[in-house]
């Protein structure tokens, strides 16, 4: 059932920028992650550190449940590059889930019960936000 109609604008959601891991892919297939250039092969490792924040740094996510991965590409980005970036981000979550399953239950994720798997994924929810592509790199 839908909520009743309202002419009031929706409440503004405030996101703490420390919890947002922004990944931009430009038309030259280069990455800008949280304002810094990064190579694709470093993305998974750095994403894991951001989500888990083992050192409790103030410039990383408060905790895995608040971490948001935001990916935005340019219309000129090669599809294979976009897929490679997305797969690295997803792989970061997969590794965190595996590590958590082993630490908590002493088993691989695929050996857990449905309830145990849910517990792991609730503690480290997969949140990848995909923004509309930009047109900056299009040729005129």
Give the role of each language-model region.
Residues 1-140:
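Long, low-hydrophobicity, acidic/polar, solvent-exposed interaction domains
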